């Protein structure tokens, strides 16, 4: 086991503070509308230019192991805030630096760090409650666009596209961000339920020009096993042929004789039929088939529940107004399932989302929910160069998260004003002894975001803070236009969830760092010790000359 170096007390806290400052000072130059860019060197390809706090934070690794601990802990603040709220990473970093910097001064002066931490925690609880009081719900298109615009660094086109996407697919809908092949940023929406399985044979195509199979007023047979034997399918095919309606078969797979017979009957014009594989894998496949059945008012024909394919009847089939199938995707539009059944299924999926701890499972459940109730929108991000495309795509993703957060918990005045407005709540918070110092730390830290926005805009921060403090409600400083305005009317708003998460995560990590009394890191190895013994020992390799005899092996 390698030897360790240990630092105690103030020496350790100073090393952490140095690391915190290096990371925070690099990240905070990006804050606000007049925030600057950071250029990151990449080992391959062009350098990355970004104004995204978490992207900058992730790139920072320091040589000194103790300083690096401080940097990594603040990096955790940024990434945790990004995970929860999707934005506010720079604000969280600025707050963490301010809380730790103020707190470590008090600890150095001999105050009890545990009591200070308790005071910080109580002050943050009070501020979070106050933020929720001044929060304002957002509903209309214009407000959603404003949140998106601000989070995308004041890019109005991105804000408008996100608002349009949310309007089309609803609160539960899935919105994905992809790179476009052109220079324009566009929005594509998919109506109904779409899953990523295309037709099993190109002979099912009804529109050769678009290479698409379109089935109007169709029936849907849903089966959870492979179909390879035609005789199992015959009874239900005869019944659907009599009805004259087109049929879509969704099964684990359709192969051999069964697929060949379907294709032949399709080509002869006896049956208007198409077949696709079931989406997903394992348990998720079963769940998705149930979703399709619920949406279309059919049943999953499964031996697990006592249904055999050869005994299937017309009332087990789902129904939809229109189905389109291309080589990659199947889209079911206007399924004829009962509204009550669909809502019951939605409720069930929502409960699963609440319970699951896995981010991957949560994402997949969210997708299923969207397919049942909302729809799917794709924002295709276009730009002139790849460097710009990557930067723009990161901004769109940030803005999308922030907008979702705003719809969830409402908005507060932006530009650091909300934190200033909540300060008055701390005036009434009287705690015992040294806990009151924790309240003072939070009071000073809450000014840090607005100060940094003013600094980045090249304005005297103290004057800005003073003016905003003396104002009321949403009165604040608009750094983009260098004016004092009503932030809500000017559309300068932050999602409450972002402001709340940034403060909670910053105070949590800063509090832990304050109560740290010892740091342990591995002792760096000396270069000389590593290289000293090697060359001499290698001399014995001369004996390898005998390998010449290996030629005979060939």
Swiss-Prot record:
EC number annotated for this UniProt entry: 5.6.1.7
Residues reported to bind ATP: 30-33, 51, 87-91, 415, 478-480, 494
NCBIfam families for this protein: GroEL, PRK00013.1, PRK12849.1, PRK12850.1, PRK12851.1
HAMAP family xref list: CH60 (MF_00600)
Catalytic activity field: ATP + H2O + a folded polypeptide = ADP + phosphate + an unfolded polypeptide
Subcellular location: Cytoplasm
Gene Ontology CC terms: cytoplasm
Family membership: Belongs to the chaperonin (HSP60) family.
Role according to the record: Together with its co-chaperonin GroES, plays an essential role in assisting protein folding. The GroEL-GroES system forms a nano-cage that allows encapsulation of the non-native substrate proteins and provides a physical environment optimized to promote and accelerate protein folding.
Predominant location category: cytoplasm
Protein's UniProt name: Chaperonin GroEL
Molecular function GO terms recorded: ATP binding; ATP-dependent protein folding chaperone; isomerase activity; unfolded protein binding
Keywords, ordered alphabetically: ATP-binding, Chaperone, Cytoplasm, Isomerase, Nucleotide-binding
Subunit-level organization: Forms a cylinder of 14 subunits composed of two heptameric rings stacked back-to-back. Interacts with the co-chaperonin GroES.
Pfam families listed in its UniProt record: Cpn60_TCP1
Biological process, per Gene Ontology: protein refolding
């Amino acid at each position: 086991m390698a030897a360790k170096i240990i630092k105690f007390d103030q020496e350790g806290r100073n090393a952490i503070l140095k690391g915190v400052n290096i990371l925070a000072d690099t990240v905070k130059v990006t804050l606000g509308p007049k925030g600057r860019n950071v250029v990151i060197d990449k080992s391959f390809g062009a350098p990355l230019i970004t104004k995204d706090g978490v992207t900058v934070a992730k790139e920072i690794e320091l040589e000194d192991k103790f300083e690096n601990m401080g940097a990594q802990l603040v990096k955790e603040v940024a990434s945790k805030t990004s995970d929860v709220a999707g934005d506010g990473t720079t604000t969280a970093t600025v707050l963490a630096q301010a809380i730790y910097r103020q707190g470590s001064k008090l600890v150095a002066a001999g105050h009890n760090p545990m009591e200070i931490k308790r005071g910080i925690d109580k002050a943050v609880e009070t501020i979070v409650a106050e933020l929720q009081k001044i929060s304002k719900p957002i509903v209309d298109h214009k407000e959603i666009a404003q949140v998106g615009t601000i989070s995308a660094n004041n890019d109005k086109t991105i804000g408008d596209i996100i608002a349009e996407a949310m309007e089309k697919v609803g609160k539960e809908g899935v919105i994905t961000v992809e790179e476009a092949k052109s220079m324009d940023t566009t929005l594509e929406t998919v109506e109904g339920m779409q899953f990523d399985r295309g037709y099993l044979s190109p002979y099912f195509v009804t529109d050769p020009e678009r290479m698409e199979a379109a089935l109007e007023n169709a029936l849907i047979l849903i089966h959870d096993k492979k179909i390879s034997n035609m005789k199992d399918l015959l009874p239900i095919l005869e019944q659907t042929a009599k009805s004259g309606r087109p049929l879509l078969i969704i099964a684990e797979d359709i192969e051999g004789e069964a697929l060949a017979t379907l294709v032949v009957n399709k080509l002869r014009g006896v049956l208007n039929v198409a077949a696709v594989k079931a989406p997903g894998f394992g348990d998720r496949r079963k769940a998705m088939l149930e979703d399709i059945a619920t949406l279309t008012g059919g049943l999953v024909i499964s031996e697990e529940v006592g249904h055999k394919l050869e005994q299937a009847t017309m009332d087990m089939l789902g129904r939809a107004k229109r189905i389109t199938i291309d080589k990659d995707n199947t889209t079911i539009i206007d399924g004829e399932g009962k509204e009550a059944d669909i809502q019951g299924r939605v409720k069930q999926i929502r409960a699963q989302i609440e319970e699951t701890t896995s981010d991957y499972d949560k994402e997949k459940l969210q997708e299923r929910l969207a397919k049942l109730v909302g729809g799917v929108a794709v924002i295709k991000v276009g730009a002139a160069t790849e460097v710009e495309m990557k930067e723009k795509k990161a901004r769109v993703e940030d803005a999308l998260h922030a907008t979702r957060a705003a719809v969830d918990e409402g908005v507060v005045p932006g530009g650091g004003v909300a934190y200033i407005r909540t300060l008055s709540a701390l005036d009434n918070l009287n705690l015992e002894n040294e806990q009151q110092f924790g309240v003072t730390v939070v009071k000073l830290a809450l000014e840090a975001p607005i100060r940094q926005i003013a600094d980045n805009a090249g304005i005297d921060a103290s004057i800005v803070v003073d003016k905003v403090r003396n104002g009321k409600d949403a009165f604040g400083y608009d750094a983009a236009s260098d004016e004092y305005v009503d932030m809500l009317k000017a559309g300068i708003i932050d999602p409450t969830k972002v402001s709340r998460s940034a403060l909670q995560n910053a105070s949590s990590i800063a509090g832990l760092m304050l109560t740290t009394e010892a740091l342990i890191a591995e002792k760096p190895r000396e270069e000389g010790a590593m290289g000293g013994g090697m060359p001499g020992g290698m001399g014995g390799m001369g004996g390898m000359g005998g390998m010449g005899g290996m030629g005979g092996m060939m």
